[in-house]
Amino acid sequence: MNSLLMITACLVLFGTVWAKEGYLVNTYTGCKYICWKLGENKYCIDECKEIGAGYGYCYGFGCYCEGFPENKPTWPLPNKTCGRK
């Protein structure tokens, strides 16, 4: 019984540690979602939760999300340069 409990706890911890995170990106332009109020930011929290991420905040003037769904892209996108040639 104790072994089963330990295995379950390890699997939960493993999923938490390896969750995807990164900057929220506009897939059309390739640009990060811009924010101005650094730290906890309602705009970033709402935008990150809308795509299924667990939490979001403003970091480096971009919305940074934790707990991204694996099927959602993060910034930078491979073939998008956000307006740069």
UniProtKB/Swiss-Prot annotation:
GO terms (BP aspect): defense response
UniProt KW Signal keyword: yes
Disulfide bond sites: 31-82, 35-58, 44-63, 48-65
Keyword Isomerase part of the UniProt annotation: no
Cellular compartments annotated: Secreted
GO cellular component terms, A-Z: extracellular region
Biological function: Beta toxins bind voltage-independently at site-4 of sodium channels (Nav) and shift the voltage of activation toward more negative potentials thereby affecting sodium channel activation and promoting spontaneous and repetitive firing.
Official protein name in the record: Toxin Cll7
